[in-house]
Amino acid sequence: MNIVPELKNRESPLVFNEKNVEKEKIEALIEAARWAPSCFNNQPWSYVFVRGGDSTRKDLEEALSPGNGWAKKAPILVAVGAKPDEDCDMNGLPYYAYDAGLSVMSMVVEAEHLGLRTHQMAGYDEKKVRKALGFHESQRIIVLIALGYEGDVKSVWDKLEQRIKDRLAQPRTRKSTEKNFFFASFGNQHG
């Protein structure tokens, strides 16, 4: 099945090239994220782009979980926050987080389109990120994203844990459609 190549070819690299990301590309990423859909058009997200030389970079890096230490080499780290109080009050569900995810996905697809790579991370200390970057206490930190041009994994191969090497050696896969997609009712495979 043919789909948009930016979706099919997206990967989350562990190694980034040191090359700086051009200002025009960052602006395009911001526009892509900005135009994402959101419940009642609330747009509850906030993005902070942190470059290697920024004064907040060291504190942000210290907020990463040990397993995400590789992200320190990325030219840009992006923190995405969202405000629960700007949520749609529908069915008790956290639409602010869903909306932020839509915005992130829009940015990720645009990054792929521009020849950039992203690696989204859940491994971080939310309080440390909030303090390092000045997010308001009312904001939740939804995700951190390493952003840049993909580097050569061979340059760090000897330093990788075996479980990571094993994962990288496998082709990228997805669950079969029969496990997640149904018609008319849950479990119904017949469309």
Give, region by region, the residue ranges found by the protein language model.
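Acidic, surface-exposed loops and disordered segments
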Residues: 1-191
